[in-house]
Every structure is written in C-alpha cells, then in structure tokens.
Amino acid sequence: MDFKAGQHQVQHLPAETLQFLLGSRYCETDVLSEEAWRLFKDTPLGWPRVQAICDFVHNHLAFGYEHARPTRTAAEAYAERRGVCRDFAHLAITFCRCLNIPARYCTGYVSDIGIPPPHAPMDFAAWMEVYLGGRWFTFDPRNNGIPFGRILIAQGRDAADVPLT
C-alpha cells in the first residue's frame, strides 16, 4: 500500500489507462459527474480521494444478496442505495472516472480471512483497481479494508467486459 500515491494529470497518464476514464455500460459518468464533484471536490487528490470514495460507497449502499440484479447500473445503485459487490464496484469506479482517476472493474474470488459476514467462504466478488502513482492499486468498496487473499479472474471496464456464465 502506498497511502501517498498521487493522482496523475490526465495528459500525463499512459495511453493504456485512458479507456478507464470513460463511461461504460454500467458506469454512467455522464449521469453521476456533477454528483461526484459535489461530493468529493474538496477531498485531497490521489489515495485520500479514492479512499473517500470507497468510504462513501461502503456507507451509502446496503449490501445484500437479495439485492442482486444483473442489469443495475451505478446510477441506479446510487439512487436505490443497495446492491451487491458489483454495484459497489461500479459506483466507486464511476465516481473515480468522473474525477479523472482511471479505474477498472475486477472480478474473482476473495478470501474470507479477516472479512466480516455476510459472505460465503471464498466468495466470488467484484472490486476495482485504480491507477495512482504510476501503478494499479486494489480497492474494495464493498468490504472497505486492506485487500488481501484475492484471486483475480478478469479485469475490464465494467461487468459487461467480464460476464459470468
């Protein structure tokens, strides 16, 4: 963890990160941009801003497997205030992108070590990676703790890039 990892100016980002600044099927940056700036405009850039986004999403959404809906977008999750891990990830990714922070969707297995219920052992989960300080860092707005014990299966712009069958 590099809690001092800084945010890059857009013109200094590597070309391969730029696609992770754009809106996508489940991450509607055009819908949530004003809200992102309203909520986080005064938050310090870089790691503190991303952590503030994760803290907000973690507290704003109610988690529950009964809330699972495969078509829910970030804007819908924000309005409905509920979802599953993919909704937490989509909302945090969207806020990051609105604030010019490259963020990508990750899916895989998360260890149950040190993570409070409700979750199944070695639960299939979604989280995000954010580009700060010249590298990608893992953030999990659903569990909102130091991420460890993850098995990455796929990465993409959002869940549409890495569908489960």
Task: List the predicted regions and their residue ranges.
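Hydrophobic/aromatic-rich core segments of domains that either
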Residues: D55, D87-T165
